[in-house]
UniProtKB/Swiss-Prot annotation:
Membrane-crossing segments per the record: 11-31, 42-62, 102-122, 149-169, 193-213, 317-337, 380-400
Record membrane topology: Multi-pass membrane protein
Biased composition (Low complexity): 460-490, 517-543, 565-582
A GO biological process held by the record: protein localization to vacuole
Glycosylation sites: 297, 545, 626
CC annotations in GO: vacuolar membrane
Presence of keyword Glycoprotein: yes
Protein name: Probable lysosomal cobalamin transporter
GO molecular function: cobalamin binding
The organism of origin for this protein: Chaetomium globosum (strain ATCC 6205 / CBS 148.51 / DSM 1962 / NBRC 6347 / NRRL 1970)
Function: Probable lysosomal cobalamin transporter. Required to export cobalamin from lysosomes allowing its conversion to cofactors.
UniProt KW Transmembrane keyword: yes
Keyword line: Cobalamin, Cobalt, Glycoprotein, Lysosome, Membrane, Transmembrane, Transmembrane helix, Transport
Region Disordered: start-end pairs: 459-588, 603-623
């Protein structure tokens, strides 16, 4: 029987290794796809890839924990298998514990030191100083290190609060003598400080979980249902070609009308010509985008992928409907469990509303229990559920953006995400802690009041299914069920499980208010998903936002050197080509320009800025309403002023 157990545990670890390799590939693709190519940094890309890989590896370790621990016991009886001797079980737990502590330590180092240092290091880069040679790598590293040390100092203060405050509150005497510090160390307050720090991060992660994941659960299925090509290439190409031909005809008429005048164009005609030239630049950009959407000058692989994507469009629609139903099912399960906890918890808020057993039918729990009859199905479902929550968090981040209260600091878009936004998004995803509940093949102890952990493992009759009722619902103390898990104590102590009933000598947490609400607890966290998912927006055809399209194309052209001009732009003699090569303006120079124009970061729209003076024509007013006319003046101002040389 020993080779069978060794084979099963080895297969679990091999599956985990394959999952981590796939996670690494997904992290690389995600980072390179979302990051803007104009401000791409090798250091930021590497740190983002490593952080996402470590985060997802930590998340996917939870199903591995469930699978390894459950493999030592019979799925039908709850008794230990013959090969699961205490030595083998201890070896499995030791391996799991090493992996747990390694990943959690790596996550902590990345979130508290590496990512802040990379963020400040990237912020300290200045292209003007680099060209002038006034900035050195050592000075840049030192400035970034100063800000990072300040951030670490704040984290240390939080740990000191967790170290001193609880013990000081329990000891009203003197607090500054040597005996007091000895008592602190003897009382294992170092672990309590770690518990406080992790609990604080998990509490913040829960708020992010409620804000971003709940919105993502609604928006992810809707995006699948409403998804359409970002640009309707044939329609946009035909419309743009017609508008461009009409525009150039109007320009030709103006030129012919003023060709015989010795004083040149009148002021009115010049304003109209300027408006037509701005409109021409916009139409040329749209024509270029339509050509890119059609796959012109693209590889055969790209065009083949576009055709395959169009063929599988109905399956994508069905997948969106399935995800929508799944999101509603998850919300219903969370609502049921929240009501069950509020009504039937024995110890109420004193232990985090823990349940001795389920009193109301819970659909998600029933699915896990039934899927446990086929060996790997329940673990695959657990991994897919975790992946769904993680994908929903990313969708919520991309939709809502990185905000402070109502102020949007960064926006996440494919191919347009700033490196700083990528690093902050990685940190925001870090505190997400989708802990599993004891569902499916988890074995737990029956109602034996003073039975210790080791005694429970030796008595198969005392183990029952995680979903079965228990007679211990009248117990007065609620504590985590004795399960041989390798999850770190400081983290496991913060998670009050719902299938628990045995007494424990000490309270489960030094900071009971910082317990992580269980996945089925905060039913309000996903309530927006049901209201948003049932909105009429899910049945409307996506509309093409031309003003946003023009703005993004303008940013692309301003962000780097452009390629050769489209043939349509050079068809008429004297046409203005928007594709003249130009250098990438440095971030600090763009900020100077933003302050002069009243824009935000040199990319936002200026309000009431018109650099050539004069009254706006009717076309100007229409274009101002769409937010496009300001860009033409910003573009001309950049060409007419030599601010790069300053």
């Amino acid at each position: 029987m020993a080779p069978a157990g060794l084979l099963q545990t080895s297969l679990i670890w091999v599956a985990y290794g394959v999952a981590v390799a796939l996670v690494l590939l997904v992290s690389v693709i995600t980072t390179l796809t979302w990051q803007t190519p104009h401000e791409r940094s090798i250091a930021v890309s590497i740190v983002s890839i490593i952080s996402l890989t470590a985060l997802l590896a930590t998340v996917f370790l939870l199903p591995v924990d469930i699978a390894l621990v459950s493999s030592t016991a019979s799925a039908h009886l709850g008794a230990k298998k013959d090969w699961a001797t205490p030595g083998r079980v201890d070896g499995i737990l030791l391996t799991l514990k090493i992996v747990y502590y390694t990943l959690y330590t790596l996550d902590a180092l990345l979130c508290l030191i590496v990512i802040p240092f990379t963020y400040f290091w990237f912020e300290e880069y200045d292209e003007v100083e680099e060209e002038e040679g006034t900035s050195s790598a050592a000075a840049r590293i030192w400035r970034a290190l100063k800000y990072t040390l300040g951030f670490v100092f704040l984290v240390v203060i939080l740990f000191l609060i967790g170290f001193f405050v609880p013990a000081a509150g329990n000891n009203p005497g003197k607090h500054m003598d040597l005996d007091y510090f000895k008592r602190l160390l003897a009382a294992n307050n170092g672990e309590k400080a770690l518990t406080f720090g992790v609990g604080l991060l998990i509490t913040l992660g829960t708020l992010l979980y409620i804000l971003y994941t709940s919105a993502g659960l609604a928006l992810l299925p809707v995006s699948f249902i409403k998804s359409a090509p970002s640009i309707s290439a044939p329609q946009l190409s035909a419309t743009t070609a017609s508008a461009l031909e009409h525009n150039r005809e109007l320009q030709r008429q103006l030129e012919m009308r003023n060709s015989g005048r010795p004083e040149g164009m009148s002021q009115k005609d010049r304003r109209e010509m300027d408006a037509l030239l701005r409109e021409e630049r916009t139409l040329v950009r749209r024509e270029r985008l339509a050509a890119e959407a059609r796959g012109d000058n693209r590889s055969k692989i790209y065009r083949a992928w576009t055709k395959v994507e169009a063929v599988f469009r109905p399956l994508k629609l069905l997948g969106g409907i399935f995800l929508l139903l799944l999101a509603i099912l998850i919300w219903v399960s969370m609502l049921i469990t929240g009501i069950d906890k509020a009504a039937n918890s024995i110890c109420k808020q004193h232990c985090g509303y823990i349940l001795g057993h389920l009193n109301v039918f819970q659909p998600i729990n029933w699915i896990f229990v039934q899927s446990a009859k086929a060996f790997p199905v329940d673990y695959i479902l657990m991994a897919l559920l975790v992946l769904l929550f993680f994908s929903s968090s990313i969708t919520g981040l991309a939709t809502i953006g990185i905000r402070f209260l109502w102020v949007r600091i960064f926006q996440l878009k494919k191919g347009r995400t700033a490196p700083q936004a990528l690093l902050i998004a990685t940190v925001l995803l870090g505190p997400h802690d989708p802990r599993h509940q004891l569902r499916g093949r988890h074995a737990r102890g029956a109602a034996v009041r003073h039975l210790r952990h080791a005694d429970l493992l030796r008595q198969p009759a005392a183990a029952t299914r995680a979903s079965s009722p228990t007679a211990a619902s009248t117990a007065t103390w609620c504590a985590p069920a004795p399960r041989p898990s390798a999850s770190p104590a400081a983290i496991g102590r913060l998670h009050a499980d719902r299938h628990v009933h045995l007494p424990q000598p000490r309270p489960p947490s030094n900071w009971p208010r910082l317990r992580r609400p269980s996945t089925s607890g905060p039913s309000s966290s996903s309530s927006p998903s049901s209201s948003s998912s049932s909105s009429p927006a899910s049945s409307r055809t996506p509309r093409l936002n031309l003003s946003e399209l023009d703005e993004e194309a303008e940013v692309d052209e301003r962000g780097g050197p452009a390629g050769p001009a489209p043939a349509a732009a050079l068809a008429r003699p004297g046409a203005i080509s928007p594709a003249a090569p130009r250098r990438t303006p440095p971030r600090r120079a763009r900020r100077v320009m933003a302050r002069r124009l009243g824009t935000r970061m040199g990319v936002g729209r200026a309000r009431g800025v018109k650099l050539n003076g004069g009254a706006a024509t009717e076309n100007d007013k229409k274009e101002k309403k769409n937010g496009t006319w300001v860009w033409a003046w910003v573009w001309e101002w950049e060409w007419q002023t030599d601010w790069l040389a300053e």
